[in-house]
From Swiss-Prot:
Gene, per the UniProt record: CYP716A53v2
Annotated protein name in UniProt: Protopanaxadiol 6-hydroxylase
This protein's pathway: Secondary metabolite biosynthesis; terpenoid biosynthesis
Record-annotated membrane-spanning stretches: 3-23
Reported function: Component of the dammarane-type triterpene saponins (e.g. PPT-type ginsenosides or panaxosides) biosynthetic pathway. Catalyzes the formation of protopanaxatriol from protopanaxadiol during ginsenoside biosynthesis, a class of tetracyclic triterpenoid saponins.
Gene Ontology cellular component list: membrane
EC numbers for this chain: 1.14.14.121
Amino acid sequence: MDLFISSQLLLLLVFCLFLFWNFKPSSQNKLPPGKTGWPIIGETLEFISCGQKGNPEKFVTQRMNKYSPDVFTTSLAGEKMVVFCGASGNKFIFSNENKLVVSWWPPAISKILTATIPSVEKSKALRSLIVEFLKPEALHKFISVMDRTTRQHFEDKWNGSTEVKAFAMSESLTFELACWLLFSINDPVQVQKLSHLFEKVKAGLLSLPLNFPGTAFNRGIKAANLIRKELSVVIKQRRSDKLQTRKDLLSHVMLSNGEGEKFFSEMDIADVVLNLLIASHDTTSSAMGSVVYFLADHPHIYAKVLTEQMEIAKSKGAEELLSWEDIKRMKYSRNVINEAMRLVPPSQGGFKVVTSKFSYANFIIPKGWKIFWSVYSTHKDPKYFKNPEEFDPSRFEGDGPMPFTFIPFGGGPRMCPGSEFARLEVLIFMHHLVTNFKWEKVFPNEKIIYTPFPFPENGLPIRLSPCTL
């Protein structure tokens, strides 16, 4: 009897071991570690709070240290989300665009920014046209317009002033440039009208997605529709005047319009222009503001930029505009822009959605889950950037940072097509700024907060004095 019981217990033990080894949760079947926080809200409030306190990287770095340096789970914007970290994570996500992941935006943002849902073929065709219009080798055609507009901006709004709010100035300039280069509007009244609507759109994008009359979200939707209406009028005028050719994005898209799936309606085109208006405005104005911010803190770097820009200025006639050759000479200034965007990235990251289940770092990433890649998993990591809190443009000399560590505009097939366009705007802005002024911050320790775009909490007021070199 005892032998029978013992044999039964032995068989039971063997069976349990069999189940344990064959059906235990494998690391390959585990979700990435982390927490999803409160229902619906998730960890969104904590994410926002870190940005508003001027420390957006805290949300990412704390969780990397607590859960995994490669990938962790959270919940943002009402979605279960996996955050990919480090250069390897960035490389994986950017290299698998249209294979395992595709670009995605929270529904609240899409509600404001898109009036139509274009087909896959139409989306690809539209993006191809944008990339072609903004490709680096085509940038030379924008220089004269950018330079002329920027020069006039400084004459109208900076000259004769002893103090300005630099961030508001950068926003004003980038909006003027965007209106002209995207759809050739430069009438001050019309630009001001669009700017007023644009501010409502931005406020709506940053608000709770409550679509009731009187809410910022509702006002944002209405303002976006009014901008589309204004653009539709321009599109109709442009179509009726077929002999008129302009070198703006609107004409580029309209002249390339195809048939069937590649035919773009007025709303398709208006959506594209609205999206580019927002993307070009926030990234560029942020970079301009950051350059002003850091050059005020580092006189020796300002002096190097001034020397470089003065050499170019002295080689020009009084009314002669900048050329492509001049832009290519602005090497140190370009490094300054890159370092400013490393410390204060124009965007905190981007979203993707998983189209096919896959494993990464021994964790499973389910189909349908959302992914967030963050600039902060690399931009301030001492593993990639020595003394990461220091402002040091020399990091970008020679070969510069290792691949997939400096990603202010993303990477891969969905990398922001306007990255070089934005740098060009900032370089021309820097040229006119440093050759005319030196400055100091009114609030020396002014903090940069994120809402979610970077913004100096006091608007970056600066005291101006004439350049003396």
